[in-house]
Amino acid sequence: DTATSGRVVVDGRDITRASENDLVEYRRADVGFVFQFYNLVPNLTALENVELAAQICPDSLDARETLEKVGLANRLSNFPAQLSGGEQQRVSIARAVAKNPKLLLCDEPTGALDYVTGKQILQLLQDTCRKDGITVVLITHNAALAPMADRLIRFKSGKVIEMSVNPSPTPISQIEW
């Protein structure tokens, strides 16, 4: 999308004025996406889906290790149709994390996961943010997750209605939903 007003500045660079090719390069190298619908390539294994994304990035993480971090070490050779919805979601998360992006955009990343796995994934995302210095933007309708955030932006009807900073985020282990 093209901005209709204002500016978007990333790492000191105004990407509002960037060419389409520059935006493609920016997204490819610096942004990881976790989609609500997983968008896995059906004829590639879990490992190959993650490797595909990692190949386009200069400082990517090891695909196998990233899949292990999301609890899929024993499902590397499975195709998406052989995985449950939650497993497919974890492949999607691993694919985004393996790019080692500066910005990770996650749309309902725990939506298809059970409670325990959801907490593990939230912990992985928080660790990725804190330890690796990656900015993680978590988009969710689950208000119970808000206390874990460093910053919170609330939307209503497509408009920002509140922005706040959380000086002491709640550990994920203490969040219940």
Label for each model-derived stretch:
Residues 1-155:
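ABC family nucleotide-binding domain
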Residues 159-177:
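Conserved beta-strand-loop-alpha-helix hinge in the C-terminal portion
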